Amino acid sequence: MRPSRRPRFRNILENRTIAAMTRSTIASFRAVSKHYGSHCALRDFNLELREGELLTLLGPSGCGKTTVLRLLAGLEIPDSGEIFLDGRTLAGVPPEARNVNTVFQSYALFPHLSVAENVAFGLRMKKLGSAEIRARTAEALRMVRLDGLGGHRPLQLSGGQQQRVALARALVNRPRVLLLDECLSALDYQLRREMQLELKGLQRQTGITFVFVTHDREEALSMSDRIAVMRTGRIEQLGPPRDIYERPANLFVAQFAGESNVLEATVTAITAPDSLIVELAGTPLTVRTDRRFRVGARLVLVLRPEDLHVHDDAAAEGGLAGHVLERTYRGVTLDTVIALDAGPRIKTSEFFREDTPALDHPPGQRVRVSWTPGWEIVLPHDPET
């Protein structure tokens, strides 16, 4: 396990994770499979959703994320396996009887109805009393900070406000599970960041289980109690964001969870239960890992760009020598592409400070790249990734 960069922050995250792990199961998928023609969208899929958590399904297009939502919502029927909600099978239960609501990417608002009428639509379909409908609609609009806009039409609102209307329309039904299908992808960057914070706040405030689908790793890492990384209809890894990012189960998860430098190496010696000497294109390196390897085994080192440091003295010991190919100023960070003498190119990302001349490495300069021992991620060689 890699040493913590921020022990206090680590404790906060771990306390939150422990709290999430003690929650009871609200819904579960058991050996669920789903095909669309010859395409297998889900295969022997297993997942438990916990009461009051925000779970994100993260993965590339076509990996089965949206199929999971559609099956839970009752919009699709599994080919095999069972889905349970509150301990009861959902087999044969129609969508309207499941107490599960979905917020879609398109929002699906009725343009001819007012904001309040859109929010109240589901309650009217349930034939609730008018007083209860008014009270619950007003409560939902306050929750998403749209009180005072109930008389407006959707087209009079901004994209972010329309998103809040869609959320209010789902929350007003007080669902057991709220499904969010890439519902932030149509927003611009700044508004998307704001809505991420609002969604987290709403989830904490209501205590409703949220299942969020995205292919955006920053959204997943910043919002979730747990993340399920999916590939070809299966979960590759399920766990808290920090585990997904810092302790990935395999190379696919490592690369999908964050920007990665991937270096192939061979084990030349085992010096301790958690320490190896590896050879990278003729360069010996000592690495730390709790995984077991034999001498001669091929493996990969995953180095996060933000974990790397660039030094002027290419002749110094330790790390990897090379020369600068490109520098990119990004305001907060300086990104550097370096061609290593060992062969591959790697990228570093360092926080930029104008009073730090050590960060000024022009193209062509000889440098050495280092990192804190133990911050490398050591994984088995995966020919499929």
Curated annotation (Swiss-Prot):
One of its GO terms (molecular function) is ATP hydrolysis activity. SUPFAM superfamilies: MOP-like, P-loop containing nucleoside triphosphate hydrolases. The keyword Membrane applies. It is a peripheral membrane protein. GO terms for cellular component: ATP-binding cassette (ABC) transporter complex. It catalyses: ATP + H2O + polyamine-[polyamine-binding protein]Side 1 = ADP + phosphate + polyamineSide 2 + [polyamine-binding protein]Side 1. Keywords: ATP-binding, Cell inner membrane, Cell membrane, Membrane, Nucleotide-binding, Translocase, Transport. ATP binds at G59, P60, S61, G62, C63, G64, K65, T66. Residues 27-257 form the ABC transporter domain. It is an enzyme of class 7 (translocase). InterPro entries: AAA+_ATPase (IPR003593), ABC_SmlMolc_Importer (IPR050093), ABC_transporter-like_ATP-bd (IPR003439), ABC_transporter-like_CS (IPR017871), Mo/tungstate-bd_C_term_dom (IPR008995), P-loop_NTPase (IPR027417), PotA-like (IPR005893), Transp-assoc_OB_typ2 (IPR013611). SMART domains: AAA (SM00382). Its EC number is 7.6.2.11. It is found in: Cell inner membrane. The keyword Hydrolase does not apply. Pfam families: ABC_tran (PF00005), TOBE_2 (PF08402). The complex is composed of two ATP-binding proteins (PotA), two transmembrane proteins (PotB and PotC) and a solute-binding protein (PotD). Part of the ABC transporter complex PotABCD involved in spermidine/putrescine import. Responsible for energy coupling to the transport system. NCBIfam families: potA, PRK09452.1. Belongs to the ABC transporter superfamily. Spermidine/putrescine importer (TC 3.A.1.11.1) family. This is Spermidine/putrescine import ATP-binding protein PotA. It comes from Methylococcus capsulatus (strain ATCC 33009 / NCIMB 11132 / Bath).
